[in-house]
């Protein structure tokens, strides 16, 4: 069975997902990780002439569902030299049961939203209960 391969830009992701979607995905991911139902191997660094590539991978749940790999390049001189962002990258998503590529996603929107979502999840579970309702997160 062949599935359509999706390519989603940063703008596509902005339109398709809301911050609350990221918060719930992060909360679920942390729960699966705590239960040992997903893999999150140690990230890899690949040196380059003027920067570094960072490779982060994971599977959900435990290889039976999806495998993702995020590759971000961090090139501090990009803005001055080329007018490009310091950090650029992509997320590759595949079916873990048969290896079929499913999507290639711009990583910047995901990375930015994930950072905020992790903070929201931490606040949800670590904030003092007498500070008020955290359901807004």
Regions from the PLM with identified roles:
Residues 1-114, 118-120:
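N-terminal ligand-binding/catalytic initiation module
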């Amino acid at each position: 069975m062949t599935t359509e391969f999706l390519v989603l830009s940063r703008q596509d992701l902005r339109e398709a997902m809301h911050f609350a979607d990221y918060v719930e995905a992060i909360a679920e991911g942390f729960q699966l990780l705590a239960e040992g139902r997903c893999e999150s191997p140690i990230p890899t660094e690949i040196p380059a002439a003027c920067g570094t590539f960072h490779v982060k991978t994971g599977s959900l749940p435990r290889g039976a569902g999806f495998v993702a790999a995020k590759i971000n390049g961090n090139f501090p001189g990009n803005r001055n030299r080329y007018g490009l962002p310091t950090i650029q990258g992509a997320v590759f998503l595949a079916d873990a049961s048969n290896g079929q590529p499913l999507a290639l996603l711009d990583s910047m929107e995901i990375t930015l939203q994930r950072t905020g979502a992790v903070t929201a999840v931490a606040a949800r579970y670590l904030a003092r209960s007498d500070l008020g309702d955290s359901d807004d997160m």
